[in-house]
Swiss-Prot record:
CDD domains: DnaJ, DnaJ_C, DnaJ_zf. This is Chaperone protein DnaJ. One of its GO terms (biological process) is protein refolding. Its cofactor is Zn(2+). One of its GO terms (molecular function) is heat shock protein binding. Keywords: Chaperone, Cytoplasm, DNA replication, Metal-binding, Repeat, Stress response, Zinc, Zinc-finger. Binds 2 Zn(2+) ions per monomer.
Length: 379
């Protein structure tokens, strides 16, 4: 009996692109899948036809050959069409992978291929003082580690993985189809060439188990909020003896009650009395290293004046110098004055001149000029 046209089988025209072909294939494969139509002989036949058609049309080379020669391109003496013979199991595996996310292959004793372990992330919060001095932190992380019972092989102690019968240990399956020789990854062993018939009882054949590990992490001085520290090989254990992933420590710095940080510089606000601002003096301010520094306040200091303490900021990573510390003074206005204090301030105000309050005098002079000018324009 003549075979149906592959495009007709999938319900697509000859100009259909890969997206259209795949969408049609998925729809029909779901419709005719044997698990959904048990006992329906027609469904099994249709499922095989859909699979065969898609196996050819999804491959650019095979599709080109089919478009030119038709079914004759795949005749090979034995009459087996594409997707059958040794490659038939592979075709079914592809369908299950496409429809069910690879669950079929995961249940086949082959397990996963050898591969690198996943990277891990660990969030750590430190204080500004710890960022200044650096620290050694002890952390605990739950992670997959290589199974000690089977040394990461996944096989029961005393046994070894055996060569895959489907591919003969090659990890690939070759199949001649007309003018072409096709090569596929073996669906039974997922390309490893071996399968585990007696899995390790501790790891179930995975080669890895979950454990909590204690690690020592060195935090260098001068780290900033958002700094990322990489610990090579401290991530998830590799699959079946593969290389371990990395561990990334992401740092965040707690807000400080006194200091604000901008890069390597520190900023703080210090209140001073009106008398100190007027007469001058010295104030002591705490520094991030736990010490204190004296700041000289000159006579007539205005509120919000900023003073710089060189080298009193944060250490600069990979350098020997430090940032600076900036002290902004805030002049406090006294509250709840006694009668005597009010009298003294009133007397001070009467005795004040333009030189005592240069900014205020200049301000009111400008206001006076403005109103006088406005009155002259209106006359």
């Amino acid at each position: 009996m003549a075979k149906r046209d592959y495009y007709e089988t999938l319900g697509c025209d000859r100009g259909a692109d890969d997206t259209v072909l795949k969408a049609s294939y998925r729809k029909l494969a779901m419709k005719w899948h044997p698990d959904r139509s048990q006992g329906n002989g027609e469904a099994e036949v249709m499922f095989k036809e859909v699979n065969e058609a898609y196996e050819v049309l999804k491959d650019p080379q095979k599709r080109a050959a089919y478009d030119r020669f038709g079914h004759a391109a795949f005749e090979n003496g034995g009459g087996g069409g594409p997707g059958f013979g040794n490659d038939f199991a592979s075709s079914f595996a592809d369908i299950f992978d496409d429809l069910f996310g690879g669950a079929m292959n995961r249940g086949r004793g082959g397990g996963q291929q050898r591969g690198r372990g996943a990277d891990l992330r660990y969030n750590m919060e430190i204080t500004l003082e710890e960022a200044f001095s650096g620290k050694t932190a002890q952390i605990k992380i739950p992670t997959s580690v290589s199974c000690e019972t089977c040394s990461g092989t996944g096989a029961k102690p005393g046994t070894q993985p055996k060569a895959c019968r489907m591919c003969g240990g090659a990890g690939k399956i070759r199949h001649a189809q007309g003018f072409f020789t096709l090569e596929r990854t073996c669906p039974n062993c997922q390309g490893r060439g071996s399968v585990i018939e007696d899995p390790c009882s501790d790891c179930g054949g995975a080669g890895r188990v979950t454990r909590e590990r204690n690690l020592s992490v060195q935090i260098p001085a001068g780290v900033e909020d958002g700094t990322r520290i990489r610990l090579g090989g401290e991530g998830e254990a590799g699959v079946r003896g593969g290389a371990a992933g990395d561990l990334y420590i992401f740092l965040s710095i707690e807000p400080h009650t006194f200091f604000q940080r901008e890069g390597a510089d520190l900023y703080c606000r210090v209140p001073i009395s009106m008398v100190t601002a007027a007469l001058g003096g010295t104030v002591e301010v705490p520094t991030i290293d736990g010490d204190k520094s004296k700041v000289k306040i000159p006579e007539g200091t205005q509120s919000q004046k900023r003073f710089r303490l060189s080298g009193k900021g944060m250490p600069i990573m990979r350098a020997r110098n430090h940032g600076d510390m900036y002290v902004q003074v805030v002049v406090e206005t006294p509250q709840k004055l006694t009668k005597r204090q009010k009298e003294l301030l009133a007397e001070f105000e009467k005795d004040s001149s333009g030189e005592t309050h240069p900014e205020s005098t200049g301000f009111f002079a400008k206001v006076k000029e403005f109103f006088q000018g406005a009155a002259g324009e209106g006359a």
